[in-house]
């Protein structure tokens, strides 16, 4: 290849559109295949579809307080969620808790049974991708506990907990109900990978 050809190629490659964009404040971690983000505690709508009517109806939804959450999504559609305490943005040392939701395994893996998982891999802006994953989670129906261990520390268990939440018995999310996992954000993202196991 001549020097002129190298210069032309370099100019064309240099003018090609580069991926990028503003980094949202809630993005916690990103590499070539995984991104993790924080969703601050807030009041959000949640939907349940339980065949036994354990929550007072076969299908029920209400706006309830939620804890802070850390989600991790990978390009292979691996998708996980953990809970965190407090309102501060998580750091590497932040302890993680079992996400108190039905359809979430003890590893944080989210059962994708009725969920419209975002398509397009990691295309689009980071903010758009985060919004798509959040929408997929909060717009789905939660149907049954999936974890082998305790989902919540709550008298009466997970069905009683969510029935009380849906009935408006807690003005703020009761963080005392969160089950500690004995691991930190850095441990699940760095040492063991985004799958937490």
Region locations from a protein language model:
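Compact alpha/beta protein-protein interaction domains typified by the UBC
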Residues: 1-121
């Amino acid at each position: 290849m001549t020097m002129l050809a190298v210069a032309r190629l370099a100019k064309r490659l240099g003018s090609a559109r580069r991926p990028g964009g503003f980094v949202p404040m809630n993005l916690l971690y990103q590499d070539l295949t995984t991104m993790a983000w924080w969703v601050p505690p807030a009041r959000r709508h949640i939907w349940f579809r339980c065949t036994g009517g354990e929550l007072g109806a076969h299908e029920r939804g209400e706006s309830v307080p939620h804890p802070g959450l850390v989600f991790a999504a990978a390009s292979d559609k691996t998708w996980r969620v953990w809970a965190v305490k407090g309102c501060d943005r998580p750091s590497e040392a932040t302890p993680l808790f079992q996400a108190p939701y039905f359809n979430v395994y003890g590893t944080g893996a989210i059962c994708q049974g009725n969920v419209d998982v975002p398509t397009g891999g990691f295309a689009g802006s980071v903010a758009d991708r985060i919004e798509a994953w959040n929408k997929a989670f909060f717009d789905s129906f939660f149907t049954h506990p999936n974890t082998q261990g305790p989902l919540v520390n709550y008298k009466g268990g997970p069905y009683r907990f969510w029935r009380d939440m849906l009935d408006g018995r807690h003005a703020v999310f009761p963080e005392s109900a969160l089950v500690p996992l004995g691991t930190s954000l850095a441990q699940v993202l760095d040492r063991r990978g985004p799958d937490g196991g």
